[in-house]
Curated annotation (Swiss-Prot):
Keywords: Autophagy, Cytoplasm, Protein transport, Transport, Ubl conjugation pathway. Residues 143-167, 201-222, 295-319 are annotated as: Disordered. The gene is atg7. SUPFAM superfamilies: Activating enzymes of the ubiquitin-like proteins. This is Ubiquitin-like modifier-activating enzyme atg7. Pfam families: ATG7_N, ThiF. E1-like activating enzyme involved in the 2 ubiquitin-like systems required for cytoplasm to vacuole transport (Cvt) and autophagy. Activates atg12 for its conjugation with atg5 and atg8 for its conjugation with phosphatidylethanolamine. Both systems are needed for the atg8 association to Cvt vesicles and autophagosomes membranes. Autophagy is essential for maintenance of amino acid levels and protein synthesis under nitrogen starvation. Residues 208-222, 304-319 have a biased composition (Polar residues). The active site is at C566 (glycyl thioester intermediate). It comes from Penicillium rubens (strain ATCC 28089 / DSM 1075 / NRRL 1951 / Wisconsin 54-1255). Homodimer.
């Protein structure tokens, strides 16, 4: 007796689902999980392509699945897996279910399967090997000849018995209708195996021809009763002639002489549980749309024709029986007993592949190091970068590394020939023909690096304190665009060259309650900081970039020599500062209080409770001695940028406030209270008495 083995047929979405479960849920857990496999009767399939177990994209979501998948963590585990033991376990499960009777409540266990897999998620290669456990019968089942079959050669006899006898169109139609009706009222795991009982009706008395009566009795004057396998033990075949009793299974095999693989386990059930050694089976292969074609066949098998029929064994005896030999590992496409490999990069959209690859390294952080890391919060934070030069280039690349999907550039400069070596978003071609706009080219470069990022560039000049307005219409338009951009983003990065260019975005960010991140460079030093936000319950908030100043920002570009006009700094300072700025930003997002996270009171070498540790206020770095200092600075009540008076004036007056701040010298100092601070300092200085002595005497300050 030959059987058509199952062949695995995996849909591409399943691999994506498996990868998602591994990254987001299973992580390092390689425990076996249920997987749903389906097979169906498909008359149109060629013989070699029939008898397939289909694994759909949602196969991992079903709790009622008889398949198991063990997705291991390394390729070495996959290669060194104890496969004989795994197959033995799968066969033992079927064997035990047959003996304890649970197989009757879930017959689909007879066609259970196991998958061993390894998902190489960096290269998107999936290694897998299916096993369809089949318990051997000893002695084997062989086809038997019906008692009314005419004499013929032994070889022809075997071939015909393997093919079986087809049902007539009337019988087939009646059987399909009965099976369809029964399948509506039973669990889907019952439908693959069932009992069928033929009821023969009395022939029509009006027909006088005995041969006609006999034909009607065999075909049209018969109907079918269908029941689950469990009904065998409730007397479903009681007082029914043997030739009218059938054990049935849905057979996806289109081979005429080779029934499907699941029959092997069904025969073990029939013999081991019920002691039956001669059985009549129906290979149910019809579909409702073609129910009159009669593809279903009846086959008759015998287990031990030379022995007396055995009686069913007692439960205790059955449970003590050893498991027979189990086979079932699938052969690969070359016919060898080996696993298969599928390379998903051949089928995936490159952009989709890039999306998943970008997420992979980040999600791996959650496996061991930081399980509570909120990657979605980082991903959906919209970042506005004011400055697309050295700092802007490095900051944007680091934000991409953290999975930020929306990055907007603002810069009014063009790419010069000195830029590409220090600014990684630009190249030599960008310097030609007067130079490309930095904001636009930076946006294009990010898209070339990672097409999944949503990025735009805006060429505009940020109005600067100390720089009087030349064309109010243009400056007002730039202000309005900047205000729209700030309102549409969650975080603002101040990455410009001059101090005064950071003033207005600081005021606007504070007024809008946005996260404001700032980085500034010296020759061998830098400062990286986050601006504080207003919190009602914490009046002593953190300061901003201008809180240590006692004067308002002024024009710092006036009368500068060449070395002052260019950003003269050690080349490594910008990458270091940019990396620290982005890491500080991400740590801030992960803190339970977000932008309101307090600065650590004292230096603590241990990680805090939240995912990425402490969130300092400022980091000041010095490459002269390679030292970083975490500094905390409180807000200054008379700050020219973040004080309540300045922020309130901006909220109330908007553009009018900005126009006065740019055009009227001393307006910001007077509004913020810095002018009063200067006056009090001068008064205090005037009150100091100086005791003048001779040149040989020390000056004593009273």
């Amino acid at each position: 007796m030959q059987y058509a083995p199952f062949a695995s047929d995996i849909e591409l979405p399943f691999y994506t689902s498996l990868a998602s479960h591994k990254i987001n849920h299973d992580k390092l857990d390689d425990s076996a999980r249920p997987v749903l496999g389906l097979y169906e009767i498909r008359p149109s399939d060629p013989e070699a392509a029939s008898c397939r177990i289909q694994i759909h994209g949602n196969a991992l979501t079903s709790s009622e699945a008889e398949g198991m998948i063990k997705n291991v963590n390394t390729v070495e585990e996959y290669r060194n897996m104890d496969r004989p033991h795994l197959l033995h376990q799968a066969g033992q499960m079927i064997w035990d279910a047959i003996h304890d009777g649970t197989i009757l409540s879930c017959p689909s266990l007879l066609c259970s399967f196991v998958i061993v897999s390894f998902a190489d998620l960096k290269k998107y290669k999936f290694h897998y090997w299916f096993a369809f456990p089949a318990i051997h019968s000893d002695p084997q089942w062989v086809p038997v000849q019906p008692t009314d079959q005419v004499s013929q050669s032994h070889q022809d006899h075997d071939i015909d018995n393997l093919k079986g006898s087809h049902l007539s169109p009337h019988e087939s139609t009646a059987l399909v209708e009965a099976v369809q009706t029964w399948s509506y009222i039973v669990d889907h795991r019952q439908r693959g195996f069932f009992l069928a009982r033929k009821s023969r009706l009395r022939p029509d008395a009006s027909s006088g021809d005995p041969q006609t009566k006999s034909a009607q009795q065999d075909t049209s004057n018969s109907n079918w009763q269908i029941a689950s396998l469990s009904e065998y033990e409730n007397g479903f075949f009681k007082n029914v002639a043997d030739e009218d009793c059938y054990f049935c299974f849905s057979d996806p095999s289109n081979y005429e002489q080779a029934p499907g693989w699941m029959l092997r386990n069904l025969l073990v059930l029939i013999k081991q549980r019920w002691g039956i050694e001669r059985v009549q089976l129906i290979r149910y292969r019809d579909v409702h749309a073609k129910r009159d074609q009669g593809r279903s066949t009846v086959i008759r098998l015998e287990s031990s024709p030379k022995q007396e029929p055995q009686t069913p064994k007692s439960l205790q005896t059955r449970e003590s029986l050893p498991l027979p030999k189990v086979t079932g590992w699938e052969r690969n496409s070359t016919g060898k007993l080996a696993g298969r490999i599928v390379n998903l990069t051949e089928y995936m959209d490159p952009k989709r592949l890039a999306d998943q690859s970008v997420d992979l390294n980040l999600k791996l952080i959650k496996w061991r190091i930081s399980p509570t890391l909120d990657l979605e919060k980082i991903k959906h934070t919209k970042c506005l970068l004011l400055g697309a030069g050295t700092l802007g280039s490095y900051v944007s690349r680091n934000l991409l590394g953290w999975g930020v999907k929306k990055i907007t550039f603002v810069d009014n400069g063009t790419v010069s020939f000195s830029n590409p070596v220090r600014q990684p978003l630009f190249n030599f071609q960008d310097c030609l023909n007067g130079g490309a706009r930095k904001a636009h080219r930076a946006s294009e470069a990010l898209t070339e690096i990672y097409p999944g990022v949503e990025t735009t560039g805006h060429a505009l000049s940020v109005p600067m304190a100390g720089h009087p307005i030349v064309d109010e219409r243009v400056t007002r338009a730039d202000f309005d665009r900047l205000q729209t951009l700030i309102d549409g983003h969650d975080a603002i990065f101040l990455l410009m060259d001059t101090r005064e260019s950071r003033w207005l975005p600081t005021v606007m960010g504070k007024a809008a309650g946005k996260i404001v991140m700032n980085a500034a460079l010296g020759f061998d030093s830098f400062v990286v900081m986050r601006h504080g936000i207003t919190e009602d319950e914490k009046p002593a908030e953190l300061g901003c970039y201008f809180c240590n100043d006692v004067v308002a920002p002024a024009n710092s570009t006036k009368d500068q020599t060449l070395d002052q006009q260019c950003t003269v700094t050690r080349p490594g300072v910008a990458p270091i500062a940019s990396a620290l700025l982005v890491e500080l930003f991400v740590s801030l997002l992960q803190h339970p209080k977000g932008a309101g996270a307090p600065a650590p009171i004292a230096r603590n070498t241990e990680r805090d409770d939240h995912p990425l540790g402490a969130v300092p206020h400022q980091i000041r770095g010095f490459l002269s001695n390679f030292e970083n200092l975490s500094v905390t600075g409180k807000s200054y009540p008379s700050c020219s940028a973040c004080s309540d008076k300045v922020v309130s004036a901006y909220r109330e007056q908007g553009w009018d406030f900005v126009r006065r701040a740019l055009n009227e010298h001393g307006y910001v100092e007077e509004l913020s209270g810095l002018k009063e601070v200067h006056e009090k300092a001068e008064e205090a200085l005037a009150d100091i008495d100086w005791d003048e002595a001779s040149d040989n005497e020390e000056i004593e300050i009273l």
